[in-house]
Swiss-Prot record:
UniProt-listed InterPro entries: AmbAllergen, Pec_lyase, Pectin_lyas_fold, Pectin_lyase_fold/virulence, PEL
Organism: Arabidopsis thaliana (Mouse-ear cress)
Keywords: Calcium, Glycoprotein, Lyase, Metal-binding, Signal
Catalytic-site annotation from UniProt: R330
GO MF annotations, alphabetized: metal ion binding; pectate lyase activity
Entry protein name: Probable pectate lyase 9
Residues listed as glycosylation sites in the UniProt record: N88, N139, N214, N233, N271, N281, N305, N374
C-alpha cells in the first residue's frame, strides 16, 4: 500500500514537472517572439528617425528608399510570422490557457491586452506587410482632442483634430469623448502622427476628409469615415509655419499622395464622393488592414494613372479587410506596382473585385471571394485598358483562395503556371477568413477590457 502511494506521489510530481515545463516553454516562445518583434521595430525606428529625411518628402529618390527590392520576400516573411503566431496560439490552447487569438496576426499582437489604454503605443509594434515600419507618433507625446469643431482651417483652434495633425513633432492623437467631426476642408496631415480613436466613437463625416500628402510615418486607426464631400479652392494650413492654396479635393475618405510608411487599420469607411482609399503619385510602403468597406462604387485605387511610371515602386499590402455590402468595384484597382492581397473577405461586388492595368503584380492568397448572383459578374479579376493579349504577361497569382457561388480568378504571367518558387508561403487557410475578419472596421474599446 505504501509502495503504491509512493508511486502515485512520484507520478504526480512528474506530471507537475512536465506541466510547468510546458508552461515555461510556451511563455518563452511568446516572449521571444514579442521581444524579437519589438527589437526589430525599435532598431528600425531609431534608424529611420536618425535619417536626414525632412518632415515632407521630396523627389523620387527618397520614396525609392522606402520600397523593398524583393516584395515576394516580404510576402514570404509575412506568411512566416503568421505561421509562428499560429504555433504559439496552438501551444497555449493545448496547455488549457484561454487565448483571444483568432489567427489575425495584427490583432493577436495587441487586442488581448485589457490594459490597451495604458499601452496604446504598443499598437505601433504590431504592423505587418509593406507598411510594417509605419511608427506614426510612437516616439512622441500624447495629444488629446477635446473639440469637434473645425471653424478655422488657416488658424485651427488648439484641442481640435486639425490643430493636432499639422504639428511638426511626433504625436499620438487620442480623443477625450465620442464626437462627430465635420471638416470644412481636407485634413492635411504632417509626418509622424498616429490618429488613435480607440475608446471613443469618432466619425469624420459629411464634409472633407483625410489627406496624407508628401509625408511619412502615419497610422490611422479606429475611425468611422463616411459621406466625404468634394471641397477646396481655398487656403488651408498644413503646418504651424505654412498655409497654402489648395485646389479641389475629390472627396476621398483617405487620400495618400507621394507618401511612405503608412498604415490604415480598423476603420469603417463608406459612401464618399470619390474613393474610400486612394494611394497615388509614387506612394509606397503601405498596409491597409482590418477595415470594413461598405456602400461605395470605386473602393480602392492603387496607382495614379497608366502613364505615371513612378508608381512602379508602389508596394501595398491589403490584408484582413471585409469588403462588404453595397460595393461595386476596385477592391483594389492596381497600376504598375506590387500588391499583396491576403486573407480578405469579399462578400459583395457588382462589377469585379480586383482589377488593374499597366502591368501590376497581384499576389492573391487565402482570400474568400463570394460572387454575386449576376452571371456576368462572377469573375473576380478584370484587366482594364489593355491592348490585345498583353495582359497575359502580367503576374496575377491566386493561391488557395476560396471561390464560392461560381466566382473565378483568371491568373496570368507567372501566376498561370502556379510556379511555387515565385509565390510566398501560404497565408492562413481561406476557411479561417470569417474568423480573421469578424472584427474588421472600427472596434468598440472599453478601459479594462479587450477591444471587441
Amino acid at each position: 500500500m505504501a509502495t503504491s502511494s509512493l508511486k502515485l506521489t512520484s507520478a504526480c510530481f512528474v506530471l507537475l514537472f512536465i506541466f510547468v515545463g510546458c508552461v515555461l516553454t510556451a511563455t518563452n516562445l511568446r516572449n521571444n517572439e514579442i521581444s524579437r518583434s519589438r527589437k526589430l521595430k525599435t532598431e528600425d525606428s531609431k534608424s529611420f528617425n536618425s535619417s536626414p529625411m525632412t518632415t515632407r518628402l521630396d523627389g523620387v529618390v527618397e520614396l525609392n528608399e522606402h520600397a523593398v527590392t524583393d516584395p515576394d520576400k516580404v510576402a514570404h516573411e509575412v506568411s512566416n510570422l503568421i505561421h509562428m503566431s499560429e504555433q504559439n496560439i496552438t501551444a497555449r490552447r493545448k496547455l488549457g490557457f484561454f487565448s483571444c487569438g483568432n489567427g489575425n496576426l495584427i490583432d493577436d499582437c495587441w487586442r488581448c491586452d485589457r490594459n490597451w489604454n495604458k499601452n496604446r503605443k504598443h499598437l505601433a509594434d504590431c504592423g505587418m506587410g509593406f507598411g510594417s515600419k509605419a511608427f506614426g507618433g510612437r516616439n512622441g507625446s500624447y495629444y488629446v482632442v477635446t473639440d469637434h469643431s473645425d471653424d478655422d482651417v488657416v488658424n485651427p483652434k488648439p484641442g481640435t483634430l486639425r490643430h493636432a495633425v499639422i504639428q511638426v513633432e511626433p504625436l499620438w492623437i487620442i480623443f477625450k469623448r465620442d464626437m462627430v467631426i465635420k471638416l470644412k476642408q481636407e485634413l492635411i496631415m504632417n509626418s509622424f502622427k498616429t490618429i488613435d480613436a480607440r475608446g471613443a466613437n469618432v466619425h469624420i463625416a459629411n464634409g472633407a476628409c483625410i489627406t496624407i500628402q508628401n509625408i511619412t510615418n502615419v497610422i490611422v486607426h479606429g475611425l468611422h469615415i463616411h459621406d466625404c464631400k468634394r471641397t477646396g479652392n481655398v487656403t488651408v494650413r498644413s503646418s504651424p509655419s505654412q498655409a497654402g492654396f489648395r485646389g479641389t479635393a475629390d472627396g476621398d475618405a483617405i487620400n495618400i499622395f507621394g507618401s511612405s510608411h503608412i498604415w490604415i487599420d480598423h476603420n469603417s469607411l463608406s459612401n464618399c464622393t470619390d474613393g474610400l482609399v486612394d494611394v497615388v503619385n509614387g506612394s509606397t510602403a503601405i498596409t491597409i488592414s482590418n477595415n470594413h468597406f461598405t456602400h461605395h462604387d470605386e473602393v480602392m485605387l492603387l496607382g495614379h494613372n497608366d502613364s505615371y511610371t513612378r508608381d512602379k515602386m508602389m508596394q501595398v499590402t491589403v490584408a484582413y479587410n471585409h469588403f462588404g455590402e453595397g460595393l461595386i468595384q476596385r477592391m483594389p484597382r492596381c497600376r504598375h506596382g506590387y500588391f499583396h492581397v491576403v486573407n480578405n473577405d469579399y462578400t459583395h461586388w457588382k462589377m469585379y473585385a480586383i482589377g488593374g492595368s499597366a502591368n501590376p503584380t497581384i499576389n492573391s492568397q487565402g482570400n474568400r471571394f463570394a460572387a454575386p448572383k449576376n452571371h456576368s459578374a462572377k469573375e473576380v479579376t478584370k484587366r482594364l485598358d489593355t491592348k490585345g493579349n498583353e495582359w497575359m504577361e502580367w503576374n496575377w497569382r491566386s493561391e488557395k483562395d476560396l471561390l464560392v457561388n461560381g466566382a473565378f480568378f483568371t491568373p496570368s504571367g507567372e501566376g498561370a503556371s502556379g510556379d511555387s518558387q515565385t509565390l510566398s508561403l501560404p497565408a492562413k487557410p481561406a476557411s479561417m477568413v470569417d474568423a480573421i475578419t469578424a472584427s474588421a472596421g472600427a472596434l468598440s474599446c472599453r478601459r479594462g477590457k479587450p477591444c471587441y
